[in-house]
């Protein structure tokens, strides 16, 4: 009897510790900063994208911090630490760049949104 009581107590403690660890991991994952990326591309075919230095100058003049500015094919990618910085930069660049450019938030390449979408569709098939 004492053996089963001790085993039950240990099992309860181990399950509680596991649940606490899982909750801590979920909280940690939710609090992680996810970088955001703005894309600048020309509307018309053959037009050139603005150079990174001029974009840097406009962002720096408005106190907006960024991680990197990278040209890629016909797109200029600007990475930020937060979505607030990205949104502020988008507003500044719409005001300061000449017309003829599209400034858009780049789609997240994380597997999590696709996984959640797939999970939602699978739940609808149940029952």
From Swiss-Prot:
It comes from the Bacteria. Residues 1-10 are cytoplasmic. It is found in: Cell inner membrane. InterPro entries: Modulator_MzrA (IPR026574), SecD-TM (IPR027398). GO terms for molecular function: protein kinase binding. The keyword Transmembrane applies. Gene3D superfamilies: 3.30.70.260. Residues 32-127 are periplasmic. The chain crosses the membrane at residues 11-31. It is a single-pass membrane protein. The keyword Transit peptide does not apply. It holds the Pfam family SecD-TM1. One of its GO terms (cellular component) is plasma membrane. Keywords: Cell inner membrane, Cell membrane, Membrane, Transmembrane, Transmembrane helix. Modulates the activity of the EnvZ/OmpR two-component regulatory system, probably by directly modulating EnvZ enzymatic activity and increasing stability of phosphorylated OmpR. Interacts with EnvZ. Belongs to the MzrA family. This is Modulator protein MzrA. The gene is mzrA.
